[in-house]
Amino acid sequence: MSEQTKSVAKSISVLSIAGIICKLIGVLFSIPLNMISPQVATVFYIVYPTYTLLLTISSAGLPVAVSRLVAGFLAKSDKNNAWNTFRSAMIMLASIGGLFSLIMIVTNSLLVNMVGVEEASAGFYAIAPCVMIVCILSAFRGLMQGQQNMVPTAISQVIEQGGKVIISLPLAYLGLKRSVMAGAAGALLGITLSEIAALIYMFFCYRSKKPAFDSLPQNPENKPLSKKVLLRDLVVISVPITISACIVPFSQFIDSAMMIKRMLLAGLTSDQAKAAYGIFTSIVIRLINIPTALALAISMSLVPAIAACKARNDQAAVRKETDTGMRYAFLIGFPCSVGMSVLAGEIVRFFYGGVSKFSADQIQLASELLTFSAMTVVLFTAVQATSSILQGLQKQRIPMYTMIAGVSVKILLNYILIGTPGIHIHGGPYASIACYSVVMILNLAFVCKYAEMKMNWIDWIIRPGLAAAVMGAVVFLMHTLLPSNRLVTILEILIGIGVYLAAAFACKAITVDDLRSMIRRRAK
């Protein structure tokens, strides 16, 4: 295994561990927040989507663009243009972030009228500075990722999410003593303070790594590019990625406006439709998001690695990194999908079984939905990997078009299936599976075309799929023989991981080299 491939494997392992920790904290955060006050939690989750939408628009594509350009310049021994790219991106991100933060402050009353909750006013003020802070933070992350050093990004993500528990929950509790508005504002202010803590950490990482960056070689034949050219390149790369990142939230907005109405036509009462939609969004989607952290880890690692190979015109290395990325995508995605599907009921009860606001019937519905929704994990992981490979190959528009095609299928199927009696909310998982299947198939075709390689069916799909099937059979047998409780669920998951690794070794889906590379987490 080459040093470049080992670096990608190490990056994936570091970001995967951090991502899973962050997702688990995110799921667990909502439970104590609801215990402090359901009203505070309601206001929090009314304000938060507006923040995430503005954040996606302002900063989704630029960190990827920075990492790709920096990796490309460094591969050609051009540290000066790599540094100028970072500086240009920092100015752009700080300006855009500052503008969006100002918009949140100036349009506070308009936003409150839009959400229809007066208690949200202070919350919008509390989280407004966060947009600019995260934009600046993402510039530092892009620089580090461009050098293929994922440790600072991983640790800063844990700081962000840890702050939600350590800072947001106490502030929500203290604020609630005054009012619901103050409680929600306290929780949202905690998010801002958490991002400040993460930014401080990244700044110190940047300062400590700067001497090493300055000592990198500079090829005198590389001419400095103007700020205009660098800004143009950043925009050309980031805009399609940003649009792609906004497509899924846009489809979720359409779903929120359509799904309840379609369920009413399917024969459900208004209360039943609202409850079913709430179960799907607040339990199932939230649980599905936990393993998707692994997909994001793969995507962040692949973009700079592929871009560096592309910059050196090393097509053999491009094929090697593409093969490695896709193999890890399915190697991680298959067991997550199979495991979540087989243990859907146990997983739902593990997190939400003791939450009083959910009835036994609602927990059962969530379990049924998660059984099918779990299949989207392997598809989403493959979509993220293929999209990142295409972005690294300077084909960033293709994932945007394929995602539009997939989401169009999803919206159409949601409209048809959810409005069908006897299916209603169960159509949501089917539509999502169809969506990501379309995107994955299209992306794979383009990856094989532009990476100039053939689909590796055996290593990508057959071997990890077979290992996941063995794991699923063993876990299902345990599930039928053992009692259902949290301790047994943890035991089943741990044994499932062990069985999967053993089966993967047996069918050569994983090699000793793979395991060594993924365990090594030493920072560069």
Where in this protein do the model-derived segments appear?
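Specific pore-lining/lateral-gate transmembrane helices of multi-pass inner-membrane transport
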Residues: 72-89, 276-374
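Membrane-interface junctions at transmembrane-helix termini in multi-pass inner-membrane proteins
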Residues: 135-156, 375-405
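Membrane-proximal transmembrane or re-entrant/amphipathic helices at the cytosolic face
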Residues: 476-524
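Alpha-helical transmembrane segments of multi-pass membrane proteins
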Residues: 117-140, 358-386
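Membrane-interface helix-loop junctions in multi-pass transport and translocation proteins
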Residues: 151, 162-200, 397, 407-441, ...
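N-terminal membrane topogenesis motif
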Residues: 1-27, 80, 84, 221-248, ...
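Signature of the first transmembrane helix
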Residues: 7-64, 101, 105, 130-131, ...
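Short membrane-interface helical motifs at transmembrane helix boundaries
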Residues: 99-121, 337-360, 413-415, 420
